[in-house]
Amino acid sequence: MTRYIFITGGVVSSLGKGITSASLGAILEAQGLTVTLLKLDPYINVDPGTMSPFQHGEVFVTEDGAETDLDLGHYERFVNATMTRKNNFTTGRVYADVIRKERRGDYLGGTIQVIPHITDEIKVKIREGADGADVALVEVGGTVGDIESLPFLEAIRQMRIELGDQQTLFIHLTLVPYVAVAGEIKTKPTQHSVKELRSIGIQPDILVCRSEQPLPDAERAKIALFTNVPEPSVISLSDVKSIYEIPLILRDQGLGNRVCEKLNIKATAADLDDWKKVVQAQKNPRHTVTVAVVGKYVDLEDSYKSLSEALIHAGIHTQTRVVIEYIDSEAIELHGTELLKKVDAILVPGGFGSRGIEGKILAAQYARENGIPYLGICLGMQIAIIEFARHKAQMENANSTEFDPKTPFPVVALVSEWMAKEGIIEKRKWGDDLGGTMRLGGQPCRLKIDSLARRLYGEDRVIERHRHRYEVNNDLIGELEKKGLVISGRSIDDRLVEMIELADHPWFVGCQFHPEFTSTPRKGHPLFIGFIKAGLAAKEAKKAVLAAPSQEKTD
């Protein structure tokens, strides 16, 4: 029997419902339970795949090829479960499926309404996503009081009635602000948020109160009194330097035990020693390395959320504080590579469109010519190919057909056909819809013997997640290989280039996939760990060169 924990948010958005949900999931998992997490998004887009990163942040890709909310990235980084397309759905997806059923005649001519048809569809999708788990944590996007969230809130209200309070639990996350002018903590916003939730028919069982500093006991008692929530169920969650501390903070306040008690679950004590090790390693680095992330969405760091976390994970596993310098590629076009002079390593992430492309190419050229560690991810690998073709293979004006359809040397072109993991042949052509038509999800990759990639992974075949519709042009690969480009990874059917390296460079790697999606704080990822180690080595080499003249003078 699956138990359901519904997590809602009040007062303001961006309080951290996703991280709180994931942290509770980590606690329950440590107590011996199988856990899954769902994210319900109230926007009308079918999925976030075609949304601007500036509006939505990162699009997280699941193993089965779904383009989902970035919170699913938090879920996978905190719990061992692998998310699927069933773990995230939107209002748009719900309405699309209901309308499809209506057109098919499934409702026998009935009038289609929000209640019961939309709410019933939401409940069906929640149950499908939760299937097989001991506990399903269901995060409802948006803020209580938003019109968009009402069908989701009504659906979970109905699930409480249908399943009872031994199988369902409501957790409400609110803001408890500190007003500096008055020198007081204000509980009134939380009181009103709970009042709004109760007017919908939902009484929260547990409150998680977000604040700058830990809540005093007197304020917790006051909140409990005015919200009808028992005082032990009012949890204080103040700001922390590392999100990986949160499972420990919530565990120490007894949140996992309270949940198990209310849901009548017999569970063991939560052993979070691995999280303690993660936090200790992050707080006590022995080295520092500076990484330039050269992109076009740098004004919103959530656009590269999994990427920044993967670099932090690599730092944890190399005892290194990773300083991330986000550099707009258009700024490099304007001011040149002087912006890269002080960094120890360069990373060019994925992206779409022609804006800022030449700045990324300059960054790749700077890394190649100066022996600086380079990691190109997805578009970043394609950028490295274009730069190499132009400046090493004498292919003047080489480009991707995404940016220049008439380029004389189309070293990167549209992927028209590939074999999916299940052996199914997928096909695409110009003019297809943008949504959901890329090469998506986990795909197997065969690594070249004696390559850097093979040494980093320690195996000859890996599965990594993809999100792209352009690939390296096989017709021109031979010419590039003659000039020193190493194809270190290929798709299992040998049709697509998955990884590249440079034989005469200390550490230069490109991958068509997104390794950041499978990096976790407890395990890291071999490519990022290798990248940070290379950055440290480059930093030490630079220091040695700078120290050499002064040593000669001393002698």
Curated annotation (Swiss-Prot):
The record lists the catalysed reaction(s) as: UTP + L-glutamine + ATP + H2O = CTP + L-glutamate + ADP + phosphate + 2 H(+); L-glutamine + H2O = L-glutamate + NH4(+); UTP + NH4(+) + ATP = CTP + ADP + phosphate + 2 H(+)
- The EC number(s) given in the record are 6.3.4.2
Q: Name one GO molecular function term.
A: identical protein binding
Q: Which Pfam families match?
A: CTP_synth_N, GATase
This protein's superkingdom? Bacteria
Q: Give residues annotated as binding UTP.
A: S13, K186, T187, K188, P189, T190, Q191, K222
Does the UniProt entry include the keyword Transcription? no
**Which pathway is this protein engaged in?**
Pyrimidine metabolism; CTP biosynthesis via de novo pathway; CTP from UDP: step 2/2
Keyword Lipid metabolism listed? The answer is no
The record's section on Gene3D superfamilies has: 3.40.50.880, P-loop containing nucleotide triphosphate hydrolases
What is the name of this protein? Answer: CTP synthase
Per the UniProt entry, what species is this protein from, by scientific name?
Answer: Coxiella burnetii (strain Dugway 5J108-111)
The gene name reads pyrG
